[in-house]
Amino acid sequence: MKKNIARILLYIICAVLVVFYIMVLWWGKNPKVGIEYRMYYLTHELTDWPGYGNLKYKYGTKEICTEYKDRNGNELHNVCSRKGQGWQKSKRYEGTKNTAKDSYIYYIPEESSDEIYLVCDITEYNTESSDGKDIEVYVNDKLIGNIDNKGVTKLKIGNVSADELLTVRFHADYAEYTLYSISLDKA
C-alpha cells in the first residue's frame, strides 16, 4: 500500500513539473511585456531604450534628435528616444544622420485627432549621390510627402487614433541627411 501511494505521489509530482515546464516555455515564447520592451529587447526595432510608457506622445512636443548630453556634458531635455533602425547611434550632437535607406521613428499618440502634421527640421541635406531624389516620408506605409531640401518641412498625416502605434519611415535611396528635430502637431 505504501508503494502505491509513493508511486501515485511521484506521478503527481512529475505531472506538476511537466505542466510547470510547459508554462515556462509558453511564457518565454509569449511574454506579457510593454510595447517598448518588446520593440527594444525582443524585435530590436528601437535603437534607444525609451523607458516604459515613453513611446506615448503628446501633440506639439518638439523633440530634438541628439544625445542626452551635449558636447560639454550638460543634460538636454526632450531628446527623441523613439528612433528605430536606420539612424546614427553615437556622436549625435548636431542631430542624427541617416545610416540606411529606411530610417524609422515610432509614436503612440495619447489622443485621437482628425488633422495631424509631421514637422521635421533637416539641418544637412546632401543629394549628390542620390540622382536628385527626395526623401520620401511614410506613416504606417502610406506616403504622406517628400522632403526636398534642408529646413523645416510640414507634412499632413491626417486622421490619427489614440493609442495606435504610428510608424514614421524616412526612405532615401542614396540621400544623406541630418534630422535635428521632429514633432507631431495639430492643425
Language-model-detected regions and their locations in the chain:
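N-terminal Sec-pathway targeting helices
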Residues: M1-V18
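Glycan-recognition and processing domains
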Residues: L10, V18-S113, D121-G132, H171-A187
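Extracellular Ig-like/FN3 beta-sandwich strand-entry sites
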Residues: S113-E115, D163-L165
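Short, surface-exposed beta-strand/strand-loop-strand elements in extracellular ectodomains
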Residues: E128-L143
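Extracellular carbohydrate recognition and processing domains
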Residues: V139-A162
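Short, aromatic- and glycine-rich surface loops/edge beta-strands on solvent-exposed regions
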Residues: E164-A172
